[in-house]
Each structure stands twice: as structure tokens, then as C-alpha cells.
Amino acid sequence: MKKVYICSPYRAKDGAELDRNIDYAQQLTRQALEAGLAPITPHLYMTQCMDDKKPEERARGMAAGLALLKGCDFVIAGVKYGITEGMDREIHTAN
């Protein structure tokens, strides 16, 4: 089973946008599973134990996510809602 890193927006200007971004990440993760892939979607679970609004915790979570990215076979970039700063970093790391 190939490992795929799911890259999509997380940060949001309000609660509705955050919910939309989480739903989108979940949809991409489900699609990857249904395609027989092993998805890695760090922003769905890192944010459960780290506060993305605290710069030091965000940096720690991003570093951990980038370490996971390096072990993946490829990346799915969900760009439906644009490319965020974090996504840009992930995409450049993958290349």
C-alpha cells in the first residue's frame, strides 16, 4: 500500500472556514483510503493536541508533519480553497 501525504488548507479566518477546511481534509483522506492508499493527514490530528494559533506549537507540528512527508510515496495537494503558507512549504519539501 502506497503512503500519500494529504496537503490542504487548515488555518482559517473564522470557525465556519475552519470547519470547511477540516471537512475538505477529511474528504481527501477518505478518497485516498477508498483508492487503496495509506493517507497521512497531519493537520487532522496534530491540531487535536497542539494549538495551531501558538507559533511555537504550530512550528513543532509543521516540523513533525514535514518529517512524515519525507516517508510518503507522493503528495495529494487539495487546492480547492487555495494554497496556504503551510501548504506551500509542504509542496516545496515534496519536490
Give the residues covered by each predicted segment.
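Catalytic phosphate/metal-binding cores of nucleic-acid and nucleotide-processing enzymes, i.e., regions
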Residues: 1-95
